[in-house]
Amino acid sequence: MKDWENIFSQSHIIPPHKQRCKHAPSEKAGYQICIETLEGTPFRQGVLERSVEVSCQLRMTLFDSTYHHFFGRTWKSSTKPIKAIPGKASKILFNEPIYFYTTLIDPSIMAVIEVVALSKKQGGSKQELSCGFGIMSLFSHQLEDDSSIQSGRLKLYYGTPRSLLHPTLKDPNELNQHMTLIENTCIQYSVRPHKVLPTVAHLFPENVLVSGSETIPGIMPSCDNSGDALKKPHVQKTVICYLDQICLFLYPTLEKFEEELTMLVNSDWLPKDDGNINGGSVSIQERRLHIGVHNGWVFVQKPQIVVVVPEAEMMRGHSTTSLKKKNIAQQKLSSTVQALVLRSRIRLPEMVNHHGFALVFLLEYVFSIPNGIHSKTPSAASSTSYMHMIRWASWTPSMEQGSADVALPLQGGPHHNPSNNLVYKMPPANMSSEEVQQVESGTVHFTFCAGSENQLEKTRDFAETTSKELIQSKKNVKMSNSKLVPETTFSPLESQVGPALSISQLTTSPRYPAISHSSKTAMQYIPSQLLPSPMAYQLSHAELPYASSITHLEADMSESHPNNSNGEHLQELLFSPVHAPIVAMGTQTGSTTSLLSRASLARLHSVEFPEILDCNNEVAEVVDPSNPVNFNLQREEADYLLCNEIVLQFLAFTRIHDGSTIWPESIFFTFQFYRFHHVTTPRLQLLQLESSDIATADPLTHVLVQINKDGSIKKGSPGFQIKYSVDPGFLKPGERKWFLRFLALQTLQIDIWDGESLLLIGSAAVEMKHLLRQGRTAVQVSHDLEVITTEYEQDLMVMSGDTAKQGTAKPIGVHTIIKGRLHMRMGNVGRPPEKKLKRRETLPPSNSRIITMHDGRTGFHGGSMLSNKSMNWKQSVCQAHKLADLDSELAAMLCSRMKEVSIAYQQTNSETDTTERRKKERMMAVRQQESQENANLRKSLIMAQHEERTQHTRDLQIIEAYRERTKPECISSMLNQAITSNYTVYATLGTAEFFEFELKNPYNIQYTVTIEIDSTDLRVITDTREWKHFKELTSTVTPIEENMFHVQPNTVIPQLYLRAKETVYIPFKYQTFCVDHTPMLQGPDAESLRKHSQLSQYKSNAMSSRRIKVSFKTSDGKLIAILQVNIEPQPHVVDQTFRFYHPELTFLKKSIRLPPWYTLPGAPVGTPGGEPDLQVRCSDINIICDSKKMGPGEPQDVFIKVAGGPSPQIKRFFIALYIDPWLAAPIQIWQIYVHSLKRVDVSCITGQLTQLSLVLRGTQVVRKVRAYSSHPEELKVDPDGVFVLPPNGIQDLHIGVRPQKAGSQFIYLNLVDVDQHQLVASWLVCVSCRKPVISKAFEIALPVGGEKGCNKRISYRNPYPTKKTYSLYTNRSDLLQFKENYFEVAAGETYSIGLRFAPSQTRGQEEILIFINDREDKNEETFCVKVRYE
């Protein structure tokens, strides 16, 4: 520990000027300054007199001439004796290297060198005397590499460097005007870049001048005799450390400590004449603990920031195993002496086994201060956060010990500390002994483990014993209240791997999380796409872990029992973005195991759904979805049934029981399979399953049936079926294996919509790997898919019982609710192709990533004019075409062509008018008869024939000229085919496709070849590191050459030098982020599906092929090779889907949080160099997308900013996430929908009706419309039925909002054309609801279990002198019903309100509000009934 303290005490540095820190820093650059010799004698006469020993020392400090500011740390050289030889110039040899790195690359940054004489007088006293100084310009010349050296002689001036701070010295270059130059004296020096130094920049501060011989913990000592460890620095090996069971105790108790702290902050911040302002005061908002590894110089990595909470709050939020073991006496003690505890386990991968490394703890408090404190106009709408450091501690671990339980005293006061901030005062030291002083400052306790988490698990076995010993040791200390330190022991299941998060840092689930269903106790690892919430399992009053809200600071990832309680909402971290991060719930497929009873399954399968038959008319083989799938690509490709007929059958839908939900009568689905068109099914009616036995009837399961135009049920088999025929005629050459890979890896995402209101019910996803036939003729699989919806809302946080307190955070909560289960069947029927395929004369595209210039893929064969479709000339057929049909320019010049066009035009017109044609025929007959009689007319006919022949001759001349002009182009095109190579790339969104082209110089002289590409998606890899990375990924064995390409300035066209007959390999990379962003229409598309009687005839969507041409040209313009890359787009994986509803014509700003990178699917294990940086790319260039790293070991945020369009426009785009620095393949792809809606803001009180009107504008035609709400129990519309919207008219739509809970939520309102089932208008109703004033409170206890409820009565007295009529409402209609919803009470009389409470099967506690409203529906009184189910 002393080693760290000694190093830390000597590491004081001065930061750069504050104005300089505001500038955007550039990249870090390392430098080496070598001080070689001091020539001459800079000492004045008489200085050395009466000195016994005189030595010389050089000192160097960085200086900012712009702001006249010294910064960094003063470097001191070793002392050298001064030996004056008469008649000979003095020369002192130093040869000392100095190292530093900086981001302030500016000519005004200089180094000031001072010459100091150290003398020892005869009396033994020592003296230091400044003899001169010089200024070294560091960045006046640009140094590019390590071989660039800036050397020179530094002139010295008399005086001290303090003279640079004199106000008259504006420019250091003007020293000659103010200072005296020391003649015949200089310092020889050199400056060179040191590019290896930034690799160890995390071990010492920026702008600090250090010698290579100085001790920097973390850098290995030099292996040679020079002792220069920074010349070729090497980092010491790191050890992963874990901290668990962290708790902090403050003296005398946490409550009294924070009370005194708050009082002092109040007196400091609030006005002196008043203790508060507008009823507000300074309060504690959050308690943070910074934990990091410090090497005496700097934190090796940015400290991890976690939030610690008082033990009492944690006990209210989580019932842990260890806390249950406490006896009654200990519980009484813990109510007085509390600790700040952290449930998370901290992982520190940057620790080094060195005595200079220490663990540093910084306790920081965040205070909420009203904005109006220091202003004349106080604001009541917001508050300001203010942070202050309270305590800190440091500890050097012993790696040989492995694991230990550690207790450290906390430090405070105005002393130097790692945070470089002022720390809260310490208790007076003159009042207590040394032992008591350590306790009075506070202590931090934790369990330490180095190397492996297994050691930490072993240490936990002794946690309880250790805690008892800790309590016993505290008994020996005399405290003012004589209370014991509480026991804080945690079970292994409570600790979460990784640091804790603030509420604004919600975690997202990985692609394959482990989730537990309410009906099962075992954990199921499900590769899913919609993560269900435990809130969906109808435990109405049970306190669930991370169920109804994920806004808690730390999600308990290990909880699996639904009877544990939720933790309280904590406050948001300071400086978090305004758009608080939301959780990426993940597009997770739900359970495929049926939850229906056997009786319901029997009734469901008794319905005559269409069977899936194979090519022999036999029922397809049934596959169990729970069985694993062994994918064998060779077996699939060897199947003789080349046609795959994919069958999707939507059979039934099961609702989730919810008494307050009004379910639709019809639904429809939207999805997209492979690269077929996006499908929107027609509306499907929900019909309840019939049963003769009422006891076994299932009122929740409904069969899907098709509907006719008039609304009647269509005859035929129930359900809805779609077939996709994927045959060799549909697939392109080489695409078959990509389609099989699509089935093996992809999931089909299905959105379920309300057929009447066009509101989204939820989404489901199903894996398609079971459709792989693996040699079988046909397979089928049945799925019961969870239909899940995700809601984002703000929960009202109550801090310290003050609901109106300023500065309370309102984090966005994420709720997932299971809306039902979709029963569907999928099948794959193998069939022989309809047309017999001809024998291929050419081989399919090769899988090799190396393309040669002459390997059979070239497009020209021996000068033949034929195409390359067939090598058999006898079978080649060429069809002649008119030249005028091939060239529009030629057709415009030909007279005969114009006549044909005229005749065709005349014929077209004559066909439209029969009478006019007859008149023209009679006129032509009359003229012909007259011409025969008249000789002059005969001559005119001869002249006409001659003119026609002249025109034909002219046309032939034009055609000849055209042929001569196009002949060079045609010959050049045919010759280019001889040097053209073709390559096919099957590309997906965001995935880089790598290949190499073997280029050979066919000439006997050297050339500089220019590579021209006609697409920006394809580029040449010019970075050797990127080239090597892709060769390792693709296992390509070809040579790599450094600095192979040259790119001219201001261009992106690479050039390559080729020797005569030389062959090289050119690396290419194709990557695109452009996809079709056209979203589906929000409505059932029945008409388009009726046009396709055979649904298997669906054509491919807009994923069209394209070609990219790469030309290799010499310096004189000759083509030596052409590469034609054929791009075949393939469907991409969609890992998660987000659907946001946002006000129209505004910017949507969202922040989505990712978990730590190593938990993501596909993340590499054991990546060297620490955590990779997350990079994101968006498919829409008009959308701003970026990522932000929160700190070591913490997740990262993805920020998006989208410009919304007019209502009801839907915008769709994709985001690709990478942890690979070269963006080889995305680890996740997100699909995001943004619905633009008209915004309506409503402010109301819980239980009270708030009414307002919306203006409806009619369209061009008359429409029959109806308004639908997403929360019909909270938002009512008037008129509530179908009404007529006149054309171009204006009409009011009245809405009434009655929220059932306090907080902020979003309600969607759609106006739908009931005839066309089209969306006419849509609104986003933003409800901000506050709690009512509770007039009376009641508490009852009800037994758990049973089928009957419980009846109770509450008395209400009419306080008015007149008779009154009241109405009753409740926020929990599923738990409470009234005997009468309306009642009358005479003046001054009392009425007994009859209540009936519903039975419950689970334990818990619920608060039910009873609203008593008057005739105008205004709230008269509100009763609160707290129900305990025991």
From Swiss-Prot:
A single cellular component GO annotation: ciliary base
Keyword Cytoplasm carried by entry: yes
UniProt-annotated location(s): Cytoplasm, Cytoskeleton, Cilium basal body
Ranges where the record places region Disordered: 828-857
CDD domains named in the record: NPHP4
Keywords, ordered alphabetically: Cell projection, Cytoplasm, Cytoskeleton
UniProt KW Oxidoreductase keyword: no
GO biological process, one term: negative regulation of canonical Wnt signaling pathway
Top-rank taxon, per record: Eukaryota
Principal place of residence: cytoplasm
Stretches the record annotates as Sufficient for basal bodies localization: 824-1430
Similarity remark: Belongs to the NPHP4 family.
Functional summary from the UniProt entry: Involved in the organization of apical junctions. Required for building functional cilia. Involved in the organization of the subapical actin network in multiciliated epithelial cells. Seems to recruit int to basal bodies of motile cilia which subsequently interacts with actin-modifying proteins such as daam1. May down-regulate the canonical Wnt pathway and promote the Wnt-PCP pathway. Acts as a negative regulator of the hippo pathway.
Name the UniProt record assigns to this protein: Nephrocystin-4
